[in-house]
């Protein structure tokens, strides 16, 4: 049987008649959290029986959760075939109430989702790569990560969250399923998470960046850059052999994006490797003419890693150079340092592996 969460609403409309029933089913699953068809009380009994015969609603199992002092939560989720993926809940702003208990400002969250079991790209600094590639996630398996985390944290269905495709896997290597997940998330009868609240991160698959742009999904784009010259980037990210920095930058320049938004460039700061002002100067030159935002990320060490976390003073100096030269730059607040929050850490930890 099919997992009904794999279907966009348009696909579901081909399965049920009349078509408006697809809207109701979406509302039951994505707004009311229904886990079975019998509870969908405004559907005819005959339709509920038919749905039970054709489809399943199969949420993943929560195998492990680690909670950080900063409120971040790292989830290890078990899929139906026994494989596991990781997802992370990142609280961005706390809820504020007045003395009467009325909500002044709603809490804001970002959910980091995985797109594959394992990864083909093989970045040297990423623990997920050590386990190799197993398979792509289905659209439903991507969507289920957010549903599961939302339910586990009692996040109201009408609370908008941001989604970043930055977990395990290379999203553009699973582009068709990721694109379907974007549509499912953004459907008005579902979670109504605007594409502008969804960021797809890529290691730099230049042709797929172009294809993503042609799909006109309206999502935000993030590029995992991490180096400013091909020699170093190739050592850190073998994908650079196929798609060098120049080809990635050209693909970014051609990518359609809302005029109010910017392309994010993620730059992992590694001590004594890419964290000096010489690299900052090259980065400014590289991004000339691009409406970009650079996100500096502290390397999150894992057992056996050959890399080290950079000094805060070096990261701050790097940021200052970029800002002084007209490049918008932020330092990502490190979250989950006490909970194995780097990709792949919780999975390896749960399996008792030492790397």
Curated annotation (Swiss-Prot):
Q: Which cysteines are joined by disulfide bonds?
A: 112-343
Gene3D superfamilies, A to Z: 1.10.150.530, Aldolase class I (3.20.20.70)
Note how many cofactor molecules are bound and how: Binds 1 [4Fe-4S] cluster. The cluster is coordinated with 3 cysteines and an exchangeable S-adenosyl-L-methionine.
Q: Which organism is it from?
A: Nitratiruptor sp. (strain SB155-2)
**Other remarks on record?**
Reaction proceeds by a ping-pong mechanism involving intermediate methylation of a conserved cysteine residue.
The gene behind this protein is rlmN
Catalytic residues, per the record, are: 86 (proton acceptor), 343 (s-methylcysteine intermediate)
Catalyzed reactions: adenosine(2503) in 23S rRNA + 2 reduced [2Fe-2S]-[ferredoxin] + 2 S-adenosyl-L-methionine = 2-methyladenosine(2503) in 23S rRNA + 5'-deoxyadenosine + L-methionine + 2 oxidized [2Fe-2S]-[ferredoxin] + S-adenosyl-L-homocysteine; adenosine(37) in tRNA + 2 reduced [2Fe-2S]-[ferredoxin] + 2 S-adenosyl-L-methionine = 2-methyladenosine(37) in tRNA + 5'-deoxyadenosine + L-methionine + 2 oxidized [2Fe-2S]-[ferredoxin] + S-adenosyl-L-homocysteine
Give GO terms: molecular function aspect only. Answer: 4 iron, 4 sulfur cluster binding; metal ion binding; rRNA (adenine(2503)-C2-)-methyltransferase activity; rRNA binding; tRNA (adenine(37)-C2)-methyltransferase activity; tRNA binding
Q: Which PANTHER family match?
A: 23S RRNA METHYLTRANSFERASE, RADICAL SAM CORE DOMAIN-CONTAINING PROTEIN
Q: What name goes with this protein? A: Dual-specificity RNA methyltransferase RlmN
């Amino acid at each position: 049987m099919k997992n009904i969460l794999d279907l966009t609403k348009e696909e579901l409309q081909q399965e049920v008649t009349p078509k408006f029933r697809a809207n109701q089913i979406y509302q039951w699953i994505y707004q009311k959290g229904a886990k079975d068809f019998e509870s969908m009380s405004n559907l005819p009994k005959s339709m509920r029986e038919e749905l039970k015969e054709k489809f399943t609603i199969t949420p993943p199992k929560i195998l492990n959760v680690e909670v950080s002092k900063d409120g971040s939560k790292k989830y290890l989720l078990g899929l139906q075939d026994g494989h596991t993926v990781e997802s992370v809940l990142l609280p961005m702003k706390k809820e504020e109430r007045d003395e009467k208990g009325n909500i002044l400002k709603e809490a804001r969250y970002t959910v980091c989702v995985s797109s594959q079991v394992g990864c083909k790209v093989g970045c040297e600094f990423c623990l997920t790569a050590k386990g190799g590639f197993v398979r792509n996630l289905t659209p439903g398996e991507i969507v289920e990560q957010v549903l599961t985390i939302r339910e586990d944290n009692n996040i109201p269905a009408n609370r908008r969250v941001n989604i970043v495709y930055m977990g395990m896997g290379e999203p553009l290597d699973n582009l068709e399923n990721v694109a379907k997940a974007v549509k499912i998330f953004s459907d008005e009868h579902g979670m109504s998470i605007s594409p502008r609240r969804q960021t797809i991160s890529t290691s730099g698959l230049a042709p797929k960046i172009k294809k993503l742009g042609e799909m006109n999904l309206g999502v935000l784009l993030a590029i995992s850059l991490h180096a400013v010259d091909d020699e170093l980037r190739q050592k850190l990210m073998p994908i650079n052999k196929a798609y060098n920095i120049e080809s990635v930058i050209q693909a970014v320049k051609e990518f359609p994006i809302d005029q109010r938004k910017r392309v994010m460039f993620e730059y992992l700061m590694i001590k004594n490797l890419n964290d000096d002002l010489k690299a900052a100067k090259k980065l400014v030159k590289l991004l000339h003419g691009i409406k970009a935002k650079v996100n500096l990320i502290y390397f999150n060490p894992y057992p056996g890693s050959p890399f080290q976390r950079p000094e805060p003073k070096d990261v701050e100096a790097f940021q200052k150079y970029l800002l002084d030269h007209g490049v918008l730059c932020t330092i990502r607040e490190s979250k989950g340092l006490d909970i194995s929050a780097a990709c792949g850490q919780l999975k390896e930890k749960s399996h008792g592996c030492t790397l």
